[in-house]
Amino acid sequence: MLIIAGLGNPGAKYAGNRHNIGFMAVDAIHRRQSFSPWSKKFKAEIAEGELGGEKVLLIKPQTYMNLSGEAVGEAMRFYKLQPADLVAIYDELDLSPGKARLKTGGGHGGHNGIRSLDAHCGKEYRRLRLGIGHPGIKEMVQNHVLGDFAKADSDWLEPLLETLADNAEMLVRNEDSQLMNKIALALGGKAEEEKPRKEGKDGEKKPAGQSHIRQARSSNQPKLPATGPMAEMLKKMFGNKGE
């Protein structure tokens, strides 16, 4: 069994906040996949279903962000689960909007919801961080995270949530890097396994598999002199071959 916990604050007042992107993520999974209606248990809203043949519990703690671990920890104890059976989805200031990172364990990074999960659930669970960007000034952080997403943010927010929901089975199968690649590609980035394209002197990008020999002869190279002493010397050295 796997618990997928989205972190956020309950109530309509906070529904559109950047801090609630974890709630938005599990809501998207709930809409796209086959889950029971939301119900209340463990100081949370929960929904049961299956992904990839494995039982999955979606959970949205209703304790407010700073006490999220109370709800998730209670659910884990009820089902006798270990930290490895938990995926937490939450907002990350230090990632650009639309970026995602998934890893096991680590620190809380100043995120009080994760601090609470660490205290109640252990630390070796998987953490899916969804970037919301940093306002650039420490004093603006609270207003930033508790502010609503702008209308323009839908350009990256919708494909991010849709791609996560469409590929939620990858969380069950521990296909973490593949999921990150799916999200990156959906947001116009490149898959991590994809080799970067080489760039020539003229700034033209070429596929990684293309020969370097042709690229070494840039079209912007200066023309060789056709007349004069230098031209005569070059003809003697290389013959009268065209380029």
Curated annotation (Swiss-Prot):
It catalyses: an N-acyl-L-alpha-aminoacyl-tRNA + H2O = an N-acyl-L-amino acid + a tRNA + H(+). The record marks N9 as: Discriminates between blocked and unblocked aminoacyl-tRNA. Keywords: Cytoplasm, Hydrolase, RNA-binding, tRNA-binding. Residues 190-207 have a biased composition (Basic and acidic residues). The active site is at H19 (proton acceptor). Its EC number is 3.1.1.29. TRNA binds at Y14, Y64, N66, N112. It holds the Pfam family Pept_tRNA_hydro. One of its GO terms (molecular function) is tRNA binding. Residues 190-243 are annotated as: Disordered. It is found in: Cytoplasm. GO terms for biological process: protein quality control for misfolded or incompletely synthesized proteins; rescue of stalled ribosome. InterPro entries: Pept_tRNA_hydro, Pept_tRNA_hydro_CS, Pept_tRNA_hydro_sf. The record marks D91 as: Stabilizes the basic form of H active site to accept a proton. Hydrolyzes ribosome-free peptidyl-tRNAs (with 1 or more amino acids incorporated), which drop off the ribosome during protein synthesis, or as a result of ribosome stalling. Belongs to the PTH family. Monomer. This is Peptidyl-tRNA hydrolase. It comes from Rhizobium etli (strain CIAT 652). The gene is pth.
